[in-house]
Amino acid sequence: MADTDIIIHDEKDNVGVVVIEKITPNQDCNCWIMENDKSLSIQSKNEIPLGHKIAMVDLNEGDTILKYGHDIGKVVKSIKKGEHVHVHNVKTKKW
């Protein structure tokens, strides 16, 4: 596969992390799953900056976000596969 655009830390993760300057809408992105050294691709729906997350699957309100194989928050507004995952649609479960 070509250069990596998105890293997925654990095979159970439902988000990946952008590792290039930015992803543009409708960009075909190359993903690398670190845990098992597998590759896959996804098409972005939005512009997503470096270090931000992208949904690897459709996520519904109330779903748990998994990163590093761990619960990092809950979906507060439905997110489609390929969309930007950030504070506008995910909140912590801590408060």
PLM features: residue spans?
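N-terminal small-residue-enriched
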Residues: 2-95
